[in-house]
């Protein structure tokens, strides 16, 4: 596994487009193919660093970059429907690598009246299921999502949902505090020097999304710039220091996880395994452990896995199922009417 980050310039443009700011159809057209090219470069870097020939690759699974996600029906031009929008042209990858590429997974679940998320629980069931323990899996990417695997569960017993913001709010606040010089609080070091502002935390925990019952999903369209602006405005009015503000929004993510477990799990998990970029934030991991004292809180690294690889592994598994025409959504998780084969194939 290798992690290849976007350049600051590309990241800023993705955030601009995904934030709903002024943009033309041409911007999205270009971005679709730019992402395809960047994914190719990342794949070539991986092959070069691992000594893998391009001709040895049999299949590529590519989720792409989400730009907008509307999981609940909205009325548009007289019609009511759900929708989701990811970019990163799979045909560009297919041309460069000369192998089948499976991409654009979420739309098929949404077409079946599902939420289109989370999709990782399919692979989590295969990898982490236990005969004797209730295992909770908390992914902390931009958005947090949690999966519950009851002891000896079947696939149809699995349930999962988005817990709320993962790193998204923390990163946006830290970017504001540093004037854009830094985009995330590495290791949670800055937050570790602050104290939680209880009044602000209480206000954040009144967030209506938290009390919505699963299945549910959310994204930048909810926890994006407008949400963060309210936090920053409040912090300025109340003269909350930067470190206290970071400590508060970090604990907020931890408390959304606690709330989700306490309100929506059928039983207390024996252990909770944290994955995604948030697992690298020691302050956040400690906050989760403090919030769930009766649960063993681990990271994927504690089990010998790479947290950053979790979603890459998940979409490789999903792509393999697609090629063999295997249903790869989990209707009990997404709320879809029926099992479907997700992913579009570029040959």
Feature annotation, model-predicted:
Residues 22-87:
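Short beta-strand-loop/turn "lid" adjacent to the catalytic site in phosphate-handling enzymes
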Residues 77-84, 91, 95, 99-182, ...:
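Phosphate-binding/catalytic loop of phosphoryl-transfer enzymes
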Residues 3-6, 153-254, 258, 325, ...:
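Conserved ATP-utilizing enzyme core subdomain
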Residues 54, 200, 245, 260-268, ...:
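Non-transmembrane, aqueous-exposed alpha-helical and coiled segments at domain scale
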Residues 289-314:
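Conserved phosphate-binding/catalytic loops in two-lobed NTP-binding clefts
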Residues 269-289:
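Glycine-rich phosphate-binding loops at beta-strand->alpha-helix junctions
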Residues 38-46, 242-268:
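Phosphate/ATP-binding catalytic cores across multiple sugar-kinase/actin-like superfamilies
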Residues 1-26, 158:
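Short glycine-rich, Thr/Ser-proximal phosphate-binding strand/loop in the N-terminal lobe
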């Amino acid at each position: 596994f290798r992690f290849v980050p976007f350049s600051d310039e590309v990241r800023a443009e993705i955030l601009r487009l995904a934030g709903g700011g002024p943009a033309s159809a041409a911007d999205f057209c270009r971005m679709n193919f730019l992402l395809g090219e960047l994914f190719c470069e990342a794949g070539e870097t991986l092959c070069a660093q691992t000594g893998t020939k391009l001709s040895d690759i049999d299949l590529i699974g590519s989720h792409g970059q989400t730009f907008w996600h509307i999981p609940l029906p909205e009325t548009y031009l007289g019609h009511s429907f759900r929708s989701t929008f990811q970019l990163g042209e799979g045909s560009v990858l297919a041309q460069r690598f000369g192998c089948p590429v499976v991409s654009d997974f979420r739309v098929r679940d949404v077409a079946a009246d599902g939420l289109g998320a989370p999709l990782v629980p399919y692979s989590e069931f295969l990898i982490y299921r236990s005969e004797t323990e209730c295992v909770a899996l908390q992914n902390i990417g931009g958005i947090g999502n949690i999966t519950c695997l009851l002891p000896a569960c079947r696939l149809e017993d699995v349930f999962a949902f988005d817990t709320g913001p993962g790193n998204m709010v923390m990163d946006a606040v830290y970017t504001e505090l540093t004037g854009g010089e830094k985009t995330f609080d590495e290791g949670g070091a800055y937050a570790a020097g602050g104290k939680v502002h209880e009044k602000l935390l209480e206000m954040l925990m009144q967030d209506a999304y938290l009390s919505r019952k699963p299945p549910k999903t959310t994204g930048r369209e909810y926890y994006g710039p407008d949400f963060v602006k309210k936090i920053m405005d409040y912090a300025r009015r109340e003269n909350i220091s930067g470190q206290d503000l970071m400590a508060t929004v970090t604990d907020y993510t931890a408390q959304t996880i606690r709330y989700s477990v306490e309100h929506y799990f059928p039983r207390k998990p024996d252990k909770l395994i944290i994955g995604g970029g948030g697992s690298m934030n020691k302050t956040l991991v400690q906050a989760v452990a403090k919030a769930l004292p009766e649960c063993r809180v681990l990271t994927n690294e504690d089990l010998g896995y790479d947290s950053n690889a979790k979603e890459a592994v998940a979409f490789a598994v999903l792509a393999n199922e697609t090629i063999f025409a295997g249903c790869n959504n989990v209707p009990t998780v997404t709320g879809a009417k029926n099992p479907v084969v997700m992913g579009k194939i570029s040959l």
